[in-house]
């Protein structure tokens, strides 16, 4: 327009402005390419594995590791997290290793276990730590409280209600969770409280590693570890002990006596065909005062983190730890009194 109107001075200014903008555009383009090169967002194997894990429930990022390397340190890792149950952990890890090297039936679950022993000795805690180690997250633990299945009419909730009944659309509480998370630890807590029909449903899972839900879908359990916990026999130990009028000879004899009492109660409660399908029946020992002292350090780590989160720092001396262990020790109730002791102690400190 400026050239047509013979306004050459204005046309020259437009030309100079165009050159300036062209130079500036090239400079910005070079800067953008350099920044893009430095901050390039690449989608690699790890990101793809995370997305697949989120969508499918299959822990691909853990499977990508060498299976042997992942399992080599399992026993030591679990023994550091679960105190004074080395024999139980050794049995558990050996059974899992046998299955992972290809010696098990390919349709059988990775492992089927029953954890026996007094309350508060680490049965449920070991299942949680195993879920974190094997599948990389505590969310891989499917926990079902079997006290909710004490009545006959509640048994169908495990695989889903029949057509025409309330809750048919929801699916089974066990089958639906395993269908969504095929790689998981299935924890059936306090199994002795369940109705006997529950054991009949579990027979097929323990043997063939599959179960049919109310929609007719076959749910695959071959990539799960099934753990059942029970306090069976502990009441007899509490009521009768080792005898009247004399103390126990030593701790080894106590543990052997406890195992024999628990084994007798186990055989009375569960059918032989049910027990015969388990890979291992693992008995947990009662905790000693030395074990409680070690557990104090583990429990205090969580307390330290909570205190630091609100802007303070807590230091507990060795004498205080010994005091907490002595106050929180009860051979019949395991580590649970220790948690209450720590809670009451922290409450008293807050009041002061």
Model region roles, listed by residue range:
Residues 347-352:
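A short, hydrophobic C-terminal helix/tail in secreted or cell-surface proteins
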Residues 1-346:
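AAA+ P-loop NTPase nucleotide-binding core of proteostasis motors
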């Amino acid at each position: 327009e400026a050239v047509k109107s013979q306004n050459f001075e204005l046309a020259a200014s437009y030309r100079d402005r165009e050159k300036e903008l062209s130079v500036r555009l090239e400079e910005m383009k070079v800067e953008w390419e350099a920044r893009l090169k430095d901050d390039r967002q690449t989608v690699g194997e790890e990101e793809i594995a995370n997305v697949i894990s989120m969508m499918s429930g299959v822990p691909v990022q853990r499977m990508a590791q060498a299976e042997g390397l992942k399992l080599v340190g399992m026993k030591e890792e679990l023994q550091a997290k679960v105190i004074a149950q080395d024999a139980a952990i050794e049995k558990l890890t050996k059974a899992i290793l046998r299955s992972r090297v290809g010696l098990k039936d390919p349709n059988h679950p990775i492992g089927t276990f029953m954890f026996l022993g007094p309350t508060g000795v680490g049965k449920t805690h070991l299942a949680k730590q195993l879920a974190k180690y094997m599948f990389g997250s505590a969310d891989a633990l499917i926990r079902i409280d079997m006290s909710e299945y004490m009545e006959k009419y509640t048994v169908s909730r495990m695989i889903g209600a029949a057509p025409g009944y309330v809750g048919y659309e929801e699916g089974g509480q066990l089958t639906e969770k395993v269908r969504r998370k095929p790689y998981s630890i299935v924890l059936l807590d306090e199994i002795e409280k369940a109705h006997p029909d529950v054991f009949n449903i579990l027979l097929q899972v323990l043997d063939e590693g599959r179960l049919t839900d109310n929609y007719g879908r076959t749910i695959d359990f071959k990539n799960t570890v099934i753990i059942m916990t029970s306090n069976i026999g502990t009441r007899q130990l509490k009521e009768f002990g080792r005898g009247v009028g004399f103390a126990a000879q030593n701790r080894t004899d106590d543990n052997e006596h406890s195992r024999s009492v628990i084994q007798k109660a186990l055989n009375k409660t569960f059918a032989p065909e049910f027990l015969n399908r388990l890979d291992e029946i693992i008995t947990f020992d009662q905790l000693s005062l030395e074990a409680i002292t070690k557990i104090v350090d583990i429990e205090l780590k969580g307390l330290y983190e909570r205190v630091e989160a609100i802007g303070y720092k807590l230091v507990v001396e060795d004498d205080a730890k010994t005091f907490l262990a002595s106050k929180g020790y009860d051979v019949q109730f395991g580590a649970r009194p220790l948690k209450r002791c720590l809670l009451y102690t922290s409450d008293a400190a807050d009041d002061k």
